[in-house]
């Protein structure tokens, strides 16, 4: 039997099908990398605003160096997808706690974005250098501003107390600089270093300083966080209210003595050791040592409110969601 004509028909049919498939696929994905077996996705660059208000001060971003520095940080937020999205989700839990404390101490609300870039809104964050908690205090600085830091208790991981300590640090820096942008830069670069460089370089604006890369980027990262939080959808982050992390309801139990076994104590409180540690990450061991007779307040999750339910999560900021 002569199979040649049938083979041609089959091959022609396959070629036609492939052409149609490719045309459809090509219309959806604009560019294909020839010979690599990969496709290029449609990326875009977030828009750099001409200016922005930070702590009540208008910052001009049209000068080429500022524009390009700002562009770099916006791109980083846009394409570090998982980190940026998770930071927004966590902010729904922690911004409502942090904002009133900032207000109480007279700290501009924009400093919550400093916290966001320091820890990605995670109270468990720890750097390679040993900085810990939402505000990334080193041990020495934490103790200097009133936090108890030892192997048993580390209040750098305490959401409220570490925020109070951060406010005290920021206020002390403002008393020195009388400029919130300088204060923000000093949080990363150190108060003495920023003041010394401003004198040495004969500049009045912190953003005009020539600094090591990490510190030079720092204020721009804070501003980029503010821009992202003001409109996540512009970065491609289309979140629903149900995507955000809930605020876990809890009751408080005051303790003035030590606790030899936190797991057994948690069970008596109607919870688990894991959940106790989740709400009280400043407890660094499986017991509470309290030789000095201090007073501690422990958070115990309320069982009835621990579960996610459809339509039960309220966005702290409506701009974060697309619904």
Which role does the model predict for each range below?
Residues 261-290:
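LysM (lysin motif) carbohydrate-binding repeats in extracellular/periplasmic proteins that recognize
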Residues 77-88, 98-101, 121-128, 132, ...:
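Second-shell loop/turn segments in exported
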Residues 129-150, 163-165, 170, 194-197:
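Substrate-binding/active-site groove segments that recognize
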Residues 279-317:
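Extracellular LysM carbohydrate-binding repeats and other cell-envelope/extracellular binding modules
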Residues 240-270, 322-323:
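Primarily a LysM-type cell-wall glycan-binding module
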Residues 170-197:
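Catalytic and binding regions of secreted/periplasmic enzymes and modules that target cell-wall glycans
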Residues 107-124, 183-190, 276-279:
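Short, functionally critical alpha-helical segments immediately adjacent to catalytic or ligand/cofactor-binding
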């Amino acid at each position: 039997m002569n199979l040649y004509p049938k083979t041609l028909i089959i091959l022609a049919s396959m070629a036609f099908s492939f052409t149609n498939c490719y045309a459809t696929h090509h219309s959806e994905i604009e560019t294909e990398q020839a010979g690599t077996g990969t496709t290029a996705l449609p990326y875009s660059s977030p828009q750099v605003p001409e200016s922005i208000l930070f702590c009540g001060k208008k910052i001009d971003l049209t000068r080429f160096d500022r524009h390009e520095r700002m562009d770099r940080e916006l791109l980083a937020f846009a394409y570090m997808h998982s980190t940026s999205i998770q930071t927004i989700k966590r902010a729904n839990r922690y911004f409502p706690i942090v904002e009133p404390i900032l207000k109480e101490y007279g700290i501009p609300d924009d400093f919550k974005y400093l916290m966001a870039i320091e820890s990605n809104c995670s109270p468990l964050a720890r750097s390679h250098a040993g900085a810990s908690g939402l505000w990334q205090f080193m041990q020495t600085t934490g103790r200097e501003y009133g936090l108890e830091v030892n192997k048993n208790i580390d209040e750098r991981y305490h959401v409220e107390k570490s925020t109070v300590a951060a406010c005290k640090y920021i206020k002390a820096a403002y008393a020195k600089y009388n400029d919130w942008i300088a204060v923000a830069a000093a949080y990363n670069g150190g108060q003495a270093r920023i003041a010394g460089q401003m004198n040495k370089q004969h500049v009045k604006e912190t953003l005009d300083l020539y600094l090591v890369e990490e510190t030079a980027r720092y204020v721009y990262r804070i501003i980029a966080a503010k821009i992202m939080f003001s409109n996540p959808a512009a970065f491609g982050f289309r979140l629903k209210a149900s995507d955000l992390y809930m605020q876990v309801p809890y009751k408080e139990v005051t303790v003035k003595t030590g606790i030899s076994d936190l797991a057994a104590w948690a069970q008596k409180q109607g919870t688990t050791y894991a959940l106790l540690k989740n709400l009280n990450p400043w407890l660094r061991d499986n017991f509470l040592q309290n030789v000095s007779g201090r007073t501690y307040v422990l958070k115990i999750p309320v069982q009835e409110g621990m579960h996610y339910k459809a339509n039960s999560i309220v966005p702290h900021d409506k701009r974060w969601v697309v619904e």
